[in-house]
């Protein structure tokens, strides 16, 4: 069962290195690039480049380069006409060897904003116009789990992390009308427990995206799709870390239904990031994790359109929720 990303959400899972690929539709203000990976135990350095074109001698609008060299630091720069510009550096290392990390680079009107594991780290002023950037390049001593290009939604959502305005879809990022849709704007790093209203209800073809991190001491977390007025839960997703299973259920008319436990794999593990896409279909929910089909859950609540609330709680740190 193939994974099809929703509009404005362009993920690549387990990409190989060196990574040098076009940015879908080109780079533009309001986009964010999410990079999840693991720093190698013997890491010396890695880099992320926002590149104008492809091939030797291409200009680099933004060069992000963590260096473990005894004087741990992160270097920032640009390259034009084959020459590096004035180097900026920060003598602080947000990455540790071996643990998983999440790097977010937000493209704002005046600068790139770098966020590591949810914490703002650096701002690098634009030296080359953003709209000229066409490719993303990543290489070095790391293993990539996913690269996500996020953008193209119509309005920002307030949240703890400053959220860039998302421009309306242009000719480069229009999506076929049969793709699943996301109704709301993204929220970055919301606190847990998390609760939000699903404006318009849980209609068929709607997709919810949840990106998060399970702490090393994590034991359990819960995701509920709920009818606010009655308390009914159309879909209850309960990863139990100590048991290594993902339990699904419903709670209707004051009673829990039969648990479903079988799944093709378990993406939830202590100390790991996850990327969950939950699609509502006419007869079932289809749930994907890290680009792979995880499970289906047939509707038990006939009026699933009445689901108007999303709840997330437990041992999880959320980095991104798109409704």
UniProtKB/Swiss-Prot annotation:
Amino acids binding a beta-D-galactoside: 256-262
Keywords of the record: Lectin, Repeat
This protein's record includes keyword Hydrolase: no
GO molecular function: carbohydrate binding
SMART domains: Gal-bind_lectin, GLECT
Keyword Repeat part of the UniProt annotation: yes
Domain Galectin: 19-150, 194-323
Cited function: Galectin that binds lactose and a related range of sugars. May be involved in the assembly of adherens junctions.
Domain notes: Contains two homologous but distinct carbohydrate-binding domains.
Quaternary structure annotation from Swiss-Prot or TrEMBL: Monomer.
Name recorded for this polypeptide: Galectin-4
């Amino acid at each position: 069962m193939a994974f099809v990303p929703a509009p404005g959400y362009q993920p690549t899972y387990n990409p190989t290195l060196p990574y040098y690929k076009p940015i879908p539709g080109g780079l533009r203000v309001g986009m964010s690039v999410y990079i999840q990976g693991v720093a190698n135990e013997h890491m010396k350095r890695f880099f992320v480049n926002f590149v104008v074109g492809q091939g030797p001698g291409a200009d680099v609008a933004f060069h992000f380069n963590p260096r473990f060299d005894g004087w741990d630091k992160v270097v920032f720069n640009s390259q034009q006409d084959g020459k590096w510009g004035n180097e900026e550096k920060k003598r602080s290392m947000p990455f540790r060897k071996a643990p998983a990390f999440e790097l977010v680079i937000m493209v704002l009107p005046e600068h790139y904003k770098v966020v590591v594991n949810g914490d703002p780290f650096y701002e690098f002023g634009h030296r080359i116009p953003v709209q000229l950037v066409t490719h993303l390049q990543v290489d070095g001593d790391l293993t990539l789990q996913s690269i996500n290009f996020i953008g193209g939604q119509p309005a920002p959502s307030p949240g703890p992390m400053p959220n860039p305005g998302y421009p309306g879809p242009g000719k480069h990022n229009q999506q076929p009308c049969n793709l699943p849709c996301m109704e709301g704007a993204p929220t970055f790093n919301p606190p847990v427990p998390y609760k939000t209203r699903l404006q318009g209800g849980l209609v068929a073809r709607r997709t919810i995206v949840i990106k998060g991190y399970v702490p090393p001491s994590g034991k359990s977390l819960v995701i509920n799709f709920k009818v606010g007025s009655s308390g009914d839960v159309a879909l209850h997703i309960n990863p139990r870390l100590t048991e290594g299973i993902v339990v699904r259920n419903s709670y209707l008319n004051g009673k829990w239904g039969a648990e479903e436990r079988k799944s093709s794999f378990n993406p939830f593990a202590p100390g790991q990031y996850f990327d969950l896409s939950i699609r509502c279909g006419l007869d079932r929910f289809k749930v994907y994790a890290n680009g792979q089909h995880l499970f289906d859950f047939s509707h038990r609540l006939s009026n699933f359109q009445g689901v108007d609330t999303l709840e997330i709680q437990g041992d999880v740190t959320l980095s991104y929720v798109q409704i």
